[in-house]
């Protein structure tokens, strides 16, 4: 869900009165006002409640989420319907409530509770400015931010209690959220603020009488509400899910590994949110989900907190218990709800926030519950008796000590009329008595947790600057405290605070770039492809031979020390040893080998979704061109690209393959995968030209990305700054970046389809028993399949990483454009139709209207014309051969359906955004190029034959020449 921006953040919209007036619209009982936020497919507006039939305005605010239904595919529409259905059934103080819903033919207007303070992510980022705003000024005065880290622990515990209260309610209904993150945790000023500031009439419109009354926590602090249930679903306790949903930085490892998961995945997200509130950064940060999972695995459950941070032992223990990689070792829901941080009183509260029972002089707790002192609106004085959540005798305790609410009992008859009771409850089946309040009284004597010098975090690799001092420090266990004198404590605390502050400033920029912007579905596809490639690799004959040779090799001790040289006398390693080393070069994902779940093609993956989104701009006519700028497409340095790199066993059938027929389904399938890989390679080469204009690399890194020994080089992900763009204007960078991005996405679409074909074949044939003769043929096919799938997997991951880099470049360049430029972010609107929205992760807008098909079509025309001219003049015929084949491959890629479907589509259906007329035009051009290409190859064969004849007819005394060109289609 797109969340409203906080009041102390600069607004990107509604800058002028005219634009505000244009935004006003009557939607049922509400008037839509100014624009406050934007999502991938929705705009969020602030609305006000109006009296029916009178148009008299009230000052109570609501949030109106206006979803453009025309931009949603079936999957997203299902998510929207699911979100509305879930919100209708959920009524809890710490869950954003649905107030109303209005549907039009083109838009769905969802009226929800308005959260004035925005989301928790902005709250943490702008924590230094909270003291300057009326809604949070008193909070910061009472609980100032620490010098190192994020929010005061009192505030963190307050939010943790409220988050636990909402989760306990969700678990009682068997719901799992699946996308808990700071951006989906919205905040409202406390009711105490509205009461004391005399602005009760400005309180947001409440869905029911208790939605603005906190169920737990501190009454004077902001109120937290969980939002965005687009990925939520009903998941019974014994069920497991396997859909990759959520935001990578806050995803549980089992989801990143594409394993089945249960509701415990939400607990991991809770741990990441608590860590970020305490430390002002997520516990794990990475550019993509593969790197993120690697960092989580490498940490091995050792959660390290920044030095100098003020964090109690109980809070650290809770976060560490939540951030366990294995769900079986992770804290359970019952343990979480009964944890001291959630169940017990919040320590170090100021006197005015203490429950009234704690301030009473009598040692015994009062019999009657304390009554609220502030006055609430009249419509909130009466609470419906059929509230979906209930109260219990535990409501009589103070708010700071109240545990979260579970499904509840009926209101007590002793409840005072007109006084909204606390929405707190006892746990089901719990017979434990309520602890006397006086047992918590000693906690008030200690105003701040003592910061000791004990090493509370697991051991980590220290920088070189710290290793020199390591010998003088004693490491203590988590349960011990270092006996440091008080004077040394102060010095050490100052040193840690200063060092932590420097690190805080250095990490802030990295955090902004690494913070997740939304839902990244492409990560799911990468996990699926990695899992399939690993599974096929395990089942290939080569890998099985490696295992046998490894067992044989382990029976004897290897004495090989190195390569044979004249000086060392080392013997060359045996063939068996060489074989067993090969898998380590390309297949290191041991965790994926253990899974044998069927591969499921995902047609709604990011590859397909991104391509469909970008191809919303019509390609009809094909005569339109992007703005012509110096140095942009097509670059003069672009030449034809070689075919998909095959092994020595000739993975591809190069040349005229019309005469090649086969009745073997396996061979046909592998041939289809190889053809798709070849098409993707051609488009990838085109994208690489654009990429290297924006991110130059050393000459040694060019080519096929293959290093010494056949090891594939990892694409550079560090070059994301603007140092290499100094010679390009922002306008030029925007154009090149958009062209590169759409070409990479087109490449991903073809790679995606090739993996779908491989997955369908693998699921169908992997379990069958074969005769010895058939098994021998299958082994050869499996070898080819393993090689091509491994290549596709590596290329898919590389394109994902590079497309992320280009996306960042594009967003940076758009920010650097003049403010009056049409492509500047403040002049763009996803709903206006003037720009194309790409994906749902970063709200990338393509302003030039370019598509991959348009670029490929223009380039194919240019290359075929160049080849035709050279053919007529007889100049450089091998180069003409490459140009013709590359142009034909580009046109074939345009016509290739990106989805692997068992049913044949109608001729009138659009495929990849192309209408029938456009496809027919491209098909005619392709046939003409193929015809000329066939004629050219005949000319080349004639030249070769003439050259051979001239060699054989040469005098015997002259040496023969063997300088003929290499085989067809070879790149020069």
From Swiss-Prot:
Which catalytic residues are annotated? 179 (proton acceptor)
- Is Protein transport there in the keyword field? yes
Q: Which stretches does UniProt call biased (Polar residues)?
A: 577-589, 961-972
Which residue positions does the secretion signal occupy? none
The protein's location, in the record's own words, is: Cytoplasm; Preautophagosomal structure membrane
- State the UniProt keywords alphabetically: ATP-binding, Autophagy, Cytoplasm, Kinase, Membrane, Nucleotide-binding, Protein transport, Serine/threonine-protein kinase, Transferase, Transport
Q: Name one GO biological process term.
A: mitophagy
Gene Ontology cellular-component terms for this entry are:
autophagosome; cytoplasm; cytosol; phagophore assembly site; phagophore assembly site membrane
Which intervals carry biased composition (Basic and acidic residues)?
437-448, 489-498, 544-555
**What protein family is recorded?**
Belongs to the protein kinase superfamily. Ser/Thr protein kinase family. APG1/unc-51/ULK1 subfamily.
Assembly, in brief, is: Homodimer. Forms a ternary complex with ATG13 and ATG17.
What protein name does the entry list? Answer: Serine/threonine-protein kinase atg1
Source organism per entry reads Phaeosphaeria nodorum (strain SN15 / ATCC MYA-4574 / FGSC 10173) (Glume blotch fungus)
Q: Recite the lineage of the species.
A: Eukaryota, Fungi, Dikarya, Ascomycota, Pezizomycotina
**By which gene is this protein encoded?**
ATG1
